[in-house]
Amino acid sequence: MTDKPGSAEDTIEMDDTCSPQFVQEVNRIKSQIKSLVEENHTRKFFRPLTSNIGDETAILRIQFNNMMSKMEEKEKQSLVKELIKMVHHVAEKNSPDRVFVGTNYERVVDQLLRYAHQKGAISTNLCAEGLIMTSDFRLCSRICQEKWKFINDCIPKIDYKGIRNILRYILESQLRRLPYSLSPEQVNEIRIVENVILHIVDRDSNLMPPLITLSEIMRGMPKQALMLPRLTEKLASLSVHFRPIADLSHVCGRGFVYPIPLHPSFYPLTSCWEEHGLNASNTIVQPHHTLPYRPEHTSTYLYTLYMILRQPLGKDSLHPPSKTKTKTNWEMLISVMICESMAEAESLPETEPIPRYQWDNIVNIVIYGITQHLLVPKTFFNVLKNLIKRCKYTRARDEVMWIVFQVVGSLSNLTRLDDAVTEIVELYNELFDGDVVWMGASDHPALFARFLAAAGTWMILEKDFADKMPPANETIKSHIKFIQDGVDNFDSSNTAMLAVLSNIYRTDTKMGKLIVPTLQQMLESIDDTKSLFELSYKRMAVNCFSAFPVEFMEALTFRSKKTLLIQCFQPLRSFSTVRLPSPAVFETVAKICESEDYEMAVKDMEHLAQRSLHVATAADRSSGEHQNVQAKDQCYFLFDFLVYRLPHLHAYSKYSSTVNALSYFTQHIPNNPQNHQIYRLMEQFLMRRWCWAGFHGCITAHTQMFGTSYKDNTMMRHMAYPKTFSVPDQYPFAINPEIFKMAIYSFLRAVKITAQDIAIEKTMFPTIINGFGWPEKSTSYFPKWALDAIKASDTSNAVNTEEILSDVRNTARMHTSLTPNQFVIRYGEDRDPATSHCMLAVLFHFAYNSVDSTYNITSEFYEVMEKKTPKEIVVMGNYLVDYIIADAKTQDCNEKTFKNIAKAAALLVFQFQVLRADRLLLSLIMHPATDEDALICIQIANEFILTPEFQERIRWYHQNVPKKDHFPTEYIKAIVKYHDAFPEFEACELVRSYDSSSNVHMPTYYGCLIERLLPIMDQYLHVALEQQGYKLNPQILQSVSMLYKFHAMPIHFMYSVLFTSHGLMSGPDAKSFVLAFATQIEECHLTEAFEKFNHQKSSREQLIMELIDRMSASLDFILTPPPFVAKDWKIAELSPGAQTLYLACIELMASPHSPETLVAAMINVMQMKPHARPFNIVNLTALLLTALPAAYSNALHDEFVAVFVNGETANLKFEEIVFDNYEESLLLNLPNRARTINVISQQYWLHCSLSLLNFFSHEYVPRILEHVKTEKDLWYTLRLVMPYLRRYYENWDTAKQMRSQRENFGPLHIVKLVFQKLGSMAEEGVEIVYEQHLCDLFYNCKYFFAGDFLRNTAITEFAKLPEKMRDRLKFYVSQSEPTAEQETPPEKEKSPEKEKEQEQEQHVKAHQPLESTPSVSSLPQMQHHLQQAPLLPSHQMMPPPQQHSSSLQHHLQHHTSTHQMMDTSQHQTIQQQSNHPTQQQLQHQIPNMSMHQQMGPQYPGAVFHHPSGPVGHVPMQYGMGHHMQQHPHLPHHQQMPAPMHTMNPMMQNMTPQQQYLYMQQLQQHQQHQQYMQQQQQHHHQHQQQPH
């Protein structure tokens, strides 16, 4: 039964843009087709005999053509799609009758389409697409061979976008419909289709860029295409052909590349290092797109992520707090880490305990992953179970269950566990599937807790998910019973059972309510019979030093530690001034903070300290003289703990804590002894926050506060005026300028070391640089913007030395003429700017003048000092330094003078105690603004350090005070003894009338003078080296180095000193410097070759190999780190890999060997012997080079250039240069030095900072290309350059700059240089052998990032290339998209019926390149077409009329006179009109539109196919076709037609000549009407023009 016309299945469904008339017309034509096929009486009677229905479509063809001629392009496409749907709808009915009917539908629709194409109503492209889609690829009916021959003939006449769409239709839409088994007859039948595909994909056909062909093939080829043997073979060879370009676009050995967390070039806060799949594409993870490549390059780089993740502290690099976190392959990676650790534990002797270094790291990673929603427990436990199932381990099963117990017991409120219960039970069954020997010891809490972790997990799951838990086995039951017995017989002295119960029972349970007071009691327990312990300066605290053993702390889960931390806060809040919190409380908090991430512990402690600071300052304002001493005590001991006990954290520089500390300094601080001490402590807090962070942390801290995102608030306005600190005005500077200046030095050193680009526009950086004076020698490593800011600084506020000397001497004389009371009134409350800050200078004047005699200070001086605020004390110290400099310049500056000055200063500091030693040294180091003043102050500081008083304190501290990380109890007791031996008094204590019954000293647990000196000594050594020619007095070096036994970041310090002074400090001095500090630093393990033999005993290659082996060992260990790294990662300065990297760099920078010889040795290492993991050595070598100063990378660049100079590329094959087979050649013992240089250079640029890519593109690549002489040289350069173009472009800020600077920036500049070099090589006659690969490479660049930015350069340079290569590149120089102002009609379409005429036309063009004359036979069609075209109002056809010029009037007169001869000499007229195309016409065309363009996405960076220009054109016209001819006299903007969607539909399918003729007639009609209205007599003869 057939469906009636107009039934529901035939009703067209169009979008809102289609008019009702259009829908009606489409339904009508469909009904006519259906009527023609379904109700044909001939078929009814003669179907068994024939399928020929005769030529009954003639009328329908004419109707169809007329209808199509009136449609816009979009409507034509919609109509063709509807016809295709109708054919497929009928053909899909599988009855024999319907198959026959479907075949007739296909024939009718095909005839309609071909007739419309023949008459010019539809484009060749649309016709071919429709014919393809009407074919029945289910093979229920036969494939029309003649139709597919027609399609094959049409292909060369279609632009490449249309050909791409045709290929898409065949592959994605039609071949997928083929059955999976074909008979030989069917294979023979579709061979014509195979021929069409082969014709399209054949590289020699050059129908479209081969890269687009490959893209379509790889994206859309169905499995059915593999049944066609010739096609399969062709596609395989096509993919193989692109292998060189695919390899070239990746770094050699990319699958084995990994960074080291905390590396100077490893900047985690940018998207550049985020692993693929963690929110942003990583620049190291370069997208392969459509290029074929190895399997390891088509998936996430798990090895890179694995190597980052398994390093302690590495996880923090992957997910900065500011980034949104998404999960990725963490489940698999952590499961592998666990299984590796279990396997390693199996190899240990049975009696040897399992090292917990890496297990603690794994637990930390798991907790972090789940809290940040990077791990899904269900997936994680399932993956882990499946891995453990394959290999039975027995040693570390308790450690695995401890991880499970941590998740179940601590993180149930942060993640879903209900769907992971089954996986947990199955994981337990896999771990303990047989007879198990259980071992647990109550005298070892950590092992005991892990022994019962499985039972604890079961108890919690049974309570929370009773309906999902299976019955426990006998082992679990016995353990649960054992735990319940511990509950029934609770014994608080059994710490092991206490830890287990604390882990299992929450605080809201009955047992939990017993555990909390027990832990609180242990915190408050007393060690000896004495209940109180005397801290420094007779402050009393609870006498308890170790509340919980270390093993007990390791037996607690994350939740239990958090509970214990909250309990520790209780005594920190509730205490009295005579009974302060015990040291045990602080040590417990310290252990928890060290074992957990910042967000889990330290953050809470910082918030508590910040609140106490606000309370203390509020108490000052509210209570006046009756200040809240308890609030100040709490504030002081909390910051004392944060500053001195936790000096270095890897999440240290927090914006909020720094801002809160700065806010404290902007307030008015009352003058009392307690506030003086808090002020000094807060200065240390800021100093360490700013200066003791890692390099990237330091940069982040400063850019957050002063960078582009700085907040224009009151505090920032304070910070913008550093010179107002001593002279208050509208915005008084908040903090000691010397501290802030020291922070800027640290910031700029970090910028130098990391080579980061700092955005300066709309930041405060130039302002704060401008506010200080900078000795020139100390600015050697400053970036250009900082030097420019210094040059622009205002020097009008320079110190007036004469005025200072006069004021001090006058004040000294006034002392003798005033009574003590008058002196105190005169100078203690004086606000005269000339004399209010000079008192320390006056005291120094007296002390210096009596340096050889005994001088005692009188009480009135202390009374004056007592009346000074903390800020005034700072200003007085700077004033003292100004006076010392001014006074020293009046004398003979010799060694004796400096010793006397230092002796007088020591008298003020250590005997009179009117000034602190650290404040004096800070002013001496940071206050001078010129090199002359800085050198004087450094020499004074040198002598001050060598004074007996200073030396005595250093030696005592070094000999008697242990490291607080390892011996906290002994440290606190030693600090008390130190203050007993060397007390520091407040000014009020030294006044005669002081009441000794009140103790003004704040409770000090950890701080002292030596601790305060540590960050200052860092800057002292930098300045001393800079001002003294990078030489240090050995005695000073020995004295200062003793302090670094207690330094929190000694390796960072040594590295930064050697980096900024590289090339300035001699080899012996550098070695002495390093060894002096290394002997004091516990974790500084240098090689024996350096310490004993100064790198002179072994060869340089052996030295490099030893350093690389150490780095590899510190990165590849599984359970226990090597002996030359820190033993505990939780309190280490650096992770193991970063520690060995920094120490290796320190050795190399202090080595007597030059950078050139060391870099040559790094290259030679790869030639020495076969390496088991060659790319690992290359990667570590690149990591070394990126962490070393620029001299080493310059040496590598020189080696690269030397390859060209020495002609080494001539010995390399093309395959050796391009392909990533370097590892294979090394494993076959076939090393090549030139290839090694290239591979190391690739990985160097991969690891380097993004900011160096500017140097790479504008300086390095041009330098290399200057030496390129041969094709192999060019390929050798491209092997280095190509992998980094995408890395450069994917940085968003860089991409924005590229869009603004276009071809003069970044990767476009590099590609432009390559084009120019290739053009110059072609002019010099250099033979290009692998031209196809070069063309493919250029297309790859065009479509992936270059676009049309380089089109003009390409036109110029490609014109110099051989003809064959130009032809392959013709698509590159075609215009991708016409601009809005320069849109033009579509290019001339071709049809099979006009093939001969077009061949003649092409022949004429070849011999007359400046003419484009249509054939005579086409003129009648054109004339007929024009006569049928309806006239539309001018506003629908033309753009808004422009102002007419005299030339236009002349043209109109000329045209009207010429038009009279149109009927008799139309051919000549058209020829005249098309003689001279303009330049704009040559550069802008519009492609044929196809129905696929509204059905699918366009190819990235797609361009349109235009035939190359005829031979003989100038180079700038290379590759451009002349598809539109215009009158030579008409201005271009007057001739451009309206956009396609506003044009007359008839014009869309005309040739350019027809369009132009039609447009001329419309213009004449419009002008004719105007002339009629104006009644111009000389136009009367043209009133009856035919249209």
UniProtKB/Swiss-Prot annotation:
<feature type="compositionally biased region" description="Basic and acidic residues">
    <location>
        <begin position="1385"/>
        <end position="1404"/>
    </location>
</feature>
<dbReference type="GO" id="GO:0006357">
    <property type="term" value="P:regulation of transcription by RNA polymerase II"/>
</dbReference>
<dbReference type="GO" id="GO:0005667">
    <property type="term" value="C:transcription regulator complex"/>
</dbReference>
<feature type="region of interest" description="Disordered">
    <location>
        <begin position="1374"/>
        <end position="1484"/>
    </location>
</feature>
<feature type="compositionally biased region" description="Low complexity">
    <location>
        <begin position="1567"/>
        <end position="1576"/>
    </location>
</feature>
<comment type="function">
    <text>Component of the Mediator complex, a coactivator involved in regulated gene transcription of nearly all RNA polymerase II-dependent genes. Mediator functions as a bridge to convey information from gene-specific regulatory proteins to the basal RNA polymerase II transcription machinery. Mediator is recruited to promoters by direct interactions with regulatory proteins and serves as a scaffold for the assembly of a functional pre-initiation complex with RNA polymerase II and the general transcription factors.</text>
</comment>
<dbReference type="GO" id="GO:0042176">
    <property type="term" value="P:regulation of protein catabolic process"/>
</dbReference>
<dbReference type="Pfam" id="PF11573">
    <property type="entry name" value="Med23"/>
</dbReference>
<keyword id="KW-0010">Activator</keyword>
<dbReference type="InterPro" id="IPR021629">
    <property type="entry name" value="Mediator_Med23"/>
</dbReference>
<protein>
    <recommendedName>
        <fullName>Mediator of RNA polymerase II transcription subunit 23</fullName>
    </recommendedName>
</protein>
<feature type="compositionally biased region" description="Basic residues">
    <location>
        <begin position="1577"/>
        <end position="1587"/>
    </location>
</feature>
<keyword id="KW-0804">Transcription</keyword>
<feature type="compositionally biased region" description="Low complexity">
    <location>
        <begin position="1430"/>
        <end position="1450"/>
    </location>
</feature>
<dbReference type="GO" id="GO:0050830">
    <property type="term" value="P:defense response to Gram-positive bacterium"/>
</dbReference>
<feature type="region of interest" description="Acidic">
    <location>
        <begin position="1387"/>
        <end position="1404"/>
    </location>
</feature>
<feature type="compositionally biased region" description="Polar residues">
    <location>
        <begin position="1410"/>
        <end position="1426"/>
    </location>
</feature>
<feature type="region of interest" description="Disordered">
    <location>
        <begin position="1567"/>
        <end position="1587"/>
    </location>
</feature>
<comment type="subunit">
    <text>Component of the Mediator complex. Interacts with let-19/mdt-13.</text>
</comment>
<dbReference type="GO" id="GO:0010628">
    <property type="term" value="P:positive regulation of gene expression"/>
</dbReference>
<comment type="similarity">
    <text>Belongs to the Mediator complex subunit 23 family.</text>
</comment>
<feature type="compositionally biased region" description="Polar residues">
    <location>
        <begin position="1463"/>
        <end position="1484"/>
    </location>
</feature>
<dbReference type="GO" id="GO:0016592">
    <property type="term" value="C:mediator complex"/>
</dbReference>
<keyword id="KW-0805">Transcription regulation</keyword>
<keyword id="KW-0539">Nucleus</keyword>
<keyword id="KW-0217">Developmental protein</keyword>
